[in-house]
Amino acid sequence: MGTEADRDGAMKQPGLGLRLAVLSRGPRLYSTRRIVEEAKKRGVDVEVCDPMKFSLVVNQGSVDVLHRGRAFAKDAVIPRIGHSITQHGVAVLRHIEQLGVWTANTGQGILQSRDKLNASQILARNRIPVPKTVYVRDILDVEHAIETVGGLP
């Protein structure tokens, strides 16, 4: 399979037939734009889909996903879910996962990464070095927590 040069002289991959969705509220964000640019450069059919524009359908024996009222027919998803819509974005992503669509990050992975204490626990349990961390809720425990980690930075 050869490549062809686009109008900028960059080499372009032949069409792969892959239908990709980038879940993002911000199609103009740099990170989203770059993903789209690179996908197009490789001949991927890519669309930015706003996670807030999905309808999730659960019926006896099936789940369906609609984006802006139309069937969501993609082969892969790259989620770019902002912190402010984590719960909804993860609900959409999990629903898409139920359809067997490949996702670059799972809903569970996104939730675990947003919970910094849980993320540290997972890393430590898998023998990946993490800074010594103490989690407290009561202000009376803060001084002891600071001592436990060896003082303030």
Task: Tell what function each PLM region has.
Residues 10-25, 29-37, 46, 66-72, ...:
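Active-site nucleotide/adenylate-binding loops and adjacent lid/helix of ATP-dependent enzymes
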Residues 42-48:
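N-terminal ordered "arm"
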Residues 51-97, 104-113:
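N-terminal glycine-rich "phosphate-gripper" loop used for MgATP/nucleotide binding
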